[in-house]
C-alpha cells in the first residue's frame, strides 16, 4: 500500500521500470494550484498580470531551491521542493503562450548567439557547467541559477523545434513518435531491458558474449551490455527504447478501443431492454 499511495508522492522511484513518472504527481499538484490561485485572484482582480504572476512563481521556486540547498530535500520536503521548483517553469510556459510568443521573432543567428554567450559566461563564472537533478532536488549554484540555465535550455530547444517543424511536420515517423512521447518516456527502460534480455539469452549459446553479467542484469537497471565494449551498441538500446514503448502504446490503445466499444454496445443493449420493459 505504501508503494502505491505514499511512495509516488515522496519519491516516485519505487518501481524502477516506470521511475520516469516521478514528476507526474508534482505536475498534477502544480496544475491544481495554478487553477485554484487564479480562481481566487479573479475574485479580486479581473485580469491577472502574467508578468507579476511569473515573478511571484519565480520567488516561490527560489524558496524551493533554497530549502533543497539547506538539506531539506528528503521525504515530504522533497515533494514540496519539486512543486516549488516546477512552478516558475509552468508559469513561464503560460507567460510565453499568452504574451511572449507573438514577439518571438528574433533572427536565429542573434538568438543562438545570445544563448551561447550567456551560457558561456555562466560556465566561466561557475568554473564548470551548472548541473541540476530536479528528481531529487539537487542543485548547483545559487538559488536562481537552476532557473536561468533551465530557461536557456528551454529557449534553445524551443527555437530548434521551430526550425525543424516545417521540415518534419508531414513525417509519419516523427508524428508517430510525437504522439507517443509520454509512452516512450514511461516505458523506455522496458525497451532497454528487452535488449539486455536478448543478450542474456544469447550469452548461453554465443561464446563471444559469454561475459554477459547476469548479476547486474538482475539487479542493476543501469546495466547495458556492450559487446566488446563498443559504444555504438548504445544505438540498439536507443531504438528499442522507442520501439518497445510504441508497441505498448499500440496494444493499450487497441485494448482501450475494444473495452470502450464493448461498453457502448452493452449500454445500447441495456437501453433497448429498458425501452422494451417501458413499452410493456
Model-flagged regions — what are they?
Residues 1-280:
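Alpha-helical transmembrane segments and their immediate juxtamembrane cytosolic regions
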Amino acid at each position: 500500500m505504501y508503494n502505491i499511495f505514499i511512495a509516488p508522492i515522496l519519491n516516485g522511484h519505487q518501481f524502477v521500470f516506470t521511475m520516469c513518472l516521478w514528476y507526474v504527481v508534482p505536475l498534477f499538484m502544480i496544475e491544481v494550484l495554478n487553477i485554484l490561485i487564479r480562481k481566487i485572484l479573479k475574485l479580486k482582480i479581473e485580469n491577472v498580470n502574467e508578468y507579476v504572476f511569473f515573478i511571484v512563481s519565480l520567488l516561490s521556486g527560489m524558496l524551493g531551491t533554497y530549502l533543497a540547498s539547506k538539506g531539506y530535500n528528503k521525504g515530504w520536503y522533497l515533494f514540496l521542493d519539486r512543486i516549488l521548483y516546477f512552478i516558475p517553469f509552468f508559469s513561464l510556459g503560460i507567460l510565453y503562450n499568452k504574451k511572449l510568443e507573438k514577439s518571438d521573432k528574433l533572427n536565429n543567428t542573434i538568438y543562438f548567439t545570445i544563448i551561447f554567450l550567456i551560457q558561456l559566461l555562466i560556465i566561466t563564472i561557475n568554473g564548470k557547467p551548472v548541473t541540476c537533478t530536479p528528481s531529487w532536488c539537487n542543485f548547483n549554484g545559487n538559488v536562481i541559477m537552476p532557473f536561468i540555465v533551465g530557461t536557456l535550455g528551454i529557449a534553445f530547444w524551443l527555437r530548434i523545434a521551430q526550425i525543424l517543424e516545417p521540415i518534419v511536420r508531414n513525417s509519419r515517423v516523427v508524428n508517430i513518435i510525437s504522439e507517443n512521447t509520454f509512452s516512450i518516456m514511461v516505458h523506455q527502460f522496458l525497451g532497454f531491458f528487452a535488449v539486455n534480455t536478448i543478450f542474456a539469452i544469447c550469452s548461453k549459446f554465443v561464446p563471444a558474449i559469454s561475459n554477459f553479467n547476469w548479476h547486474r542484469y538482475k539487479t542493476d537497471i543501469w546495466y547495458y551490455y556492450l559487446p566488446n565494449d563498443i559504444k555504438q551498441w548504445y544505438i540498439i538500446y536507443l531504438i528499442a527504447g522507442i520501439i518497445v514503448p510504441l508497441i505498448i502504446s499500440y496494444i493499450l490503445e487497441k485494448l482501450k478501443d475494444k473495452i470502450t466499444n464493448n461498453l457502448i454496445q452493452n449500454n445500447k443493449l441495456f437501453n433497448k431492454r429498458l425501452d422494451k420493459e417501458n413499452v410493456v
